[in-house]
Design a protein with these regions (language model features):
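C-terminal peripheral helix-coil segments that are non-catalytic and often amphipathic
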Residues: 87-94, 123-139, 154-196
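Short, basic, alpha-helical segments at the C-terminal edge of helix-turn-helix-like DNA-binding modules
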Residues: 61-66
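Amphipathic, non-transmembrane alpha-helical scaffold segments
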Residues: 56, 60, 103, 115-126, ...
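Hydrophobic alpha-helical connector segments
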Residues: 69-100, 148-155, 182
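All-alpha amphipathic helical-bundle segments outside canonical DNA-binding/catalytic cores
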Residues: 116-121, 138-154
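N-terminal intrinsically disordered/low-complexity leader segments
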Residues: 1-8, 168, 196
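Amphipathic alpha-helical segments used for helix-helix packing
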Residues: 92-116, 164-168
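Helix-turn-helix
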Residues: 12, 16, 20-54, 58
Length: 196
């Protein structure tokens, strides 16, 4: 019972921390607000995470853990790319804290471990897209004279960025708008990579 209660408290603290850090960043976040929102005292917060920076790191890791993407190794490159872009959009739309906390990971006072966790997540996402592009080159679907790395980085950045206008364009959360943006991005990349 004690372990379950402890886990539930820790999870409440992390959920409150994600909201606070996503809203205010590391420098503007206040541990008293996090503790109040989680229904615990500040001492318990420090008991679990050691410091505000430790709590920030744990919150970033929790957000990134939920934002895992899985690239399919089967199918046509264009369809695999479409699926992966959709996954990137979905994890971003499903975790409003993701983009703000990723951006905050490069600010002053953030631990190297937090910045490294974000860099590793981003590198895995780029690697997944790059692999699809390389597979497309090997199978003859895409030109072999292209460097897949910068294209992959552009695809990941654009995929993550398409969620922001979709949120502001339609109040419902706008999966229709995200679908249109995803399809346009994939079409642009496939057209650029195609043999001419």
């Amino acid at each position: 019972m004690g372990g379950e209660h402890s886990t539930a408290r820790r999870d409440r603290i992390l959920a409150a921390a994600e909201r606070e850090f996503a809203t205010h960043g590391l420098s503007g976040a206040r541990v008293d607000r996090i503790a109040a929102r989680a229904g615990v005292n500040k001492q318990l917060l420090f008991h679990y995470f050691g410091s505000k920076a430790g709590l920030h790191h744990a919150a970033i890791v929790a957000v990134l853990d939920r934002a895992q993407i899985r690239a399919s190794a089967h199918g046509q490159p264009a369809e695999r790319l479409r699926q992966l872009v959709g996954e990137l959009q979905d994890v971003t739309a499903g975790s409003p804290a993701l983009l703000t906390m990723m951006a905050d990971a490069n600010s002053a006072g953030v631990t190297d471990n937090s910045a490294r966790a974000v860099d590793e997540w981003y590198a895995r996402a780029i690697g997944s897209v790059r692999q699809i592009l390389v597979d497309g080159q090997r199978s003859g679907h895409f030109r072999d004279d292209l460097d897949a790395a910068p294209i992959a980085e552009l695809v990941v950045s654009a995929s993550l960025g398409t969620v922001v206008p979709a949120r502001s364009a339609e109040p419902s959360g706008s999966s229709k708008s995200r679908d249109q943006l995803r399809d346009t991005l994939v079409r642009l990349v496939v057209d650029y990579c195609a043999w001419r």
